[in-house]
A protein has these predicted regions:
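ATP-dependent small-molecule kinase phosphotransfer cores
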Residues: 33-108
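Small-molecule kinase domains that catalyze NTP-dependent phosphoryl transfer to phosphate-bearing small molecules
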Residues: 94-98, 124-125, 145, 149-201, ...
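P-loop (Walker A) phosphate-binding loop of NTP-binding proteins
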Residues: 9, 21
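Walker A/P-loop
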Residues: 15
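ATP-dependent NMP and nucleoside kinases share a basic, alpha-helical "lid"
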Residues: 96-105, 109-145
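ATP-binding Walker
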Residues: 12
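Hydrophobic anchor at the beta1->P-loop junction of P-loop NTPases
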Residues: 6
Length: 209
């Protein structure tokens, strides 16, 4: 089985690419969705985060004030590092469980979809890393339209993310979203079929990690 990480900056078209892989029957895990799920009310991580970042990051009903947590975590580098050290291990544990289930089911290809893969343990789980890129102005326009914010705010958000050149330096596969949607979907389909074939040759039922 081949494990592919798909990543990219906001507004790059990553969701379009992962939708193509899903349509081809590829099992995939959304690491960003897992990061939201593990912070839902009742999660054992919440009191740990409250001890580190302040009890007031939790509302009276026990749910997380995500904006306040983000404000405090990103106020200093050590805050972001502390947040990552608490949250990322649980994300990786869940990713690994789903990856093993896909392998045991005989899948030839498994996809880890996440905005933050590069530089984390999730990257170590990948045989290939695909970065989806798009022109800066295109990404800004998409973010502004999607989130209902001014282009200037969208640009600031994008500039705060990992630089594209850093992602590209770690990637062995690149999908450039600089034409129309159909072109991106076609390129993603070709890549998916190539990797499915590679994974089938490798063997889907190998139970080694």
């Amino acid at each position: 089985m081949i494990t592919l990480g798909i990543t990219g900056r906001s507004g790059c078209g990553k969701s379009t690419v992962t939708a193509v892989f899903a349509a081809h029957g590829v099992p995939l895990v959304d690491a960003d969705q897992i990061s939201r799920e593990i912070l839902l009310p009742g999660s054992p991580l919440l009191p740990v985060l409250a001890r580190r970042f302040g009890a007031d990051i939790l509302y009276a009903d026990g749910s997380l004030n995500r904006r306040l947590l983000a404000d405090r975590a990103f106020a200093a580098p050590e805050g972001k590092a502390a947040l990552d050290s608490l949250v990322l291990p649980e994300i990786i544990r869940r990713v690994c469980r789903l990856k093993q289930a896909a392998r045991e089911a005989g899948a030839s290809l498994f996809v880890i979809d996440g905005a933050v893969i590069v530089g984390t343990d999730a990257e170590k789980e990948c045989d290939h890393l695909c970065v989806v890129t798009a022109p800066f102005a295109t990404s800004v326009a998409r973010i502004a339209a999607r989130d209902g914010i001014a282009p200037e705010m969208a640009a600031r958000r994008l500039n705060a993310q990992t630089p594209e050149e850093v992602l590209l330096a770690r990637a062995d596969l690149v999908l450039r979203n600089d034409a129309d949607l159909a072109s991106l979907e076609a390129a993603a389909a070709v890549l998916c079929e190539q990797l499915q074939a590679e994974g089938a040759r490798k063997g889907g039922a190998d139970t080694s990690l």
